[in-house]
Amino acid sequence: MPFNGEKQYVNEDQQSDSESSRFSESTASLSDYGCSRQSFTSDSSSKSSSPASTSPPRGIMFDDVMAAAKNLSDMTLAHEIAVNENFQLRPNALPENSLAGQVKRVVHQAFWDVLEADLSAEPPQYEYAIKLFEEIREILLSFLTPGGNRLHSQICEVLDIDLIRQQAEHSAVDIQGLANYVISTMGKICAPVRDEDIRELKATTNIVEMLRQIFRVLDLMRMDMTNFVIRNIRPHIQHHLVEYERNKFQEVLEETPNALSQTTEWLKESIDKELFSETDVAPGAEHSSTPSLSPLTVLNNCYLKLLQWDYQKNVLPETLMTDGPRLQELTEKLNQLKMIACVSLITNNMVGAVTEGLPELANRLKRISAVLLEGMSKQTFNLKEALNSIGVQTCAEVNKALKERGSPTLNAEVQANLVGQFTSLEEKDNPVCALMDKRIQLYMKSLLCLPSTQKSRPPVPGGLDVIQQELEVLGCQYANIVNLNKQVYGPFYANIFRKLLFRDEAMGKIDASLPTN
């Protein structure tokens, strides 16, 4: 069957489909997937040319904007399917109390009320019912593979709209019989996850409610089929992702001027910082016409800045838009891990001697910190209050462990000092946070500098042992995002570096520093 463990769809003269089942309407629905389109067109027309562009800015036509948005949408969807193994379409339910949701419910209810009145009239009016069966027929046929097969012919024969209209003229339409046939056919081609829905349909006695639920289940079946198509095309997209995404982004650049303005500024800030640090190290050194800094080092520093990015206030570089949600989630998790490491370091420094040899206690304190710091990225989160609670809980757990060993508990002064140091972690320039942040950055940087042939991970810096497992997982995710981004956008970065570093000099050496494969 097409679905992994799911029922097979119906194929040529059979009651089942092969693994290569393709549905015309399913692929069309993929274009509905929403994605971010900001920063490519919003500011480009009002800004002067960036250093990466030598041609004067031109006006942006509406068609250019729409074409760029379409390319960006396609590129984002392909990227999401390729890198997110869990990506799938889900029902788009409107909020229950929203205006749009209320309007939709009222309009739909009005339609079904009219249908019920028509079918209850004497004689019955079948016009709306016929239109529904016509739509149902098209949906069922869209689930089948192209070409003639027995089920295709059967659906067309049973749901022959012209014949049904002739029967309606003589008030001889068997609405219940048609609905039962539709439900039976749906049961043959649906995924196992819809079996319960089919059973509920068969148990429905009211014909109008039955038709209403048929459309609900058909919508779910279309979504199932689309997700099946996504799963099947994922390996193909992954294989061609770098070339496809690069070509799509090139089309965006051709449609919109200065479409790399944010990316150029992102790279320029790191270049300026590196050049400034070189000047600080050797203030008397003779100025060289050729910058000595490595473009790859600058690019890695740019990627490291993303781990401290303010995703609420700052717009991401255009070349990283497709990975924005993943980078934001990764950064939020990393901040939580950093705080857990800070709490653990303070605990070990203050009461490590009395808790030595109690690994269960360390794990329990880590779980307490993780739970109380859950959601710390939200603006409504009270970090100081959470840290205070962690301090109180830590003191209680340590005292409990000490009592079990027959040792004296922590005195009030030590407990107050411990809680106070915990709450001070929310201060901007806290030295413990700065130290942990520096070590995490060092570890992440070492991941980016690993040779492609090296399989082993770099060692985790001291003080991060408590979060080593989680840090390695996040580090692997981060390195995968960065390495794919380098492969796709390496040529664009190289071009920007040429113009920022060498201006009018035709320097081709930079290409060797930026891997594009």
Swiss-Prot record:
> Biased composition, Low complexity: where in the chain?
17-55
Q: Where is this region: Disordered?
A: 1-59
- InterPro entries attached to this UniProt entry: Tcp11
Q: Look up keyword Phosphoprotein and say if it applies.
A: yes
Q: What is its main location?
A: cytoplasm
The family classification in the record reads: Belongs to the TCP11 family.
Q: What does this protein do?
A: Promotes the migration of muscle-derived satellite cells (MDSCs) during differentiation throught interaction with FMNL2 and therefore may participate in microfilament assembly.
| Protein name, per record | T-complex protein 11-like protein 2
Please report the organism this UniProt entry assigns to the protein.
Answer: Rattus norvegicus (Rat)
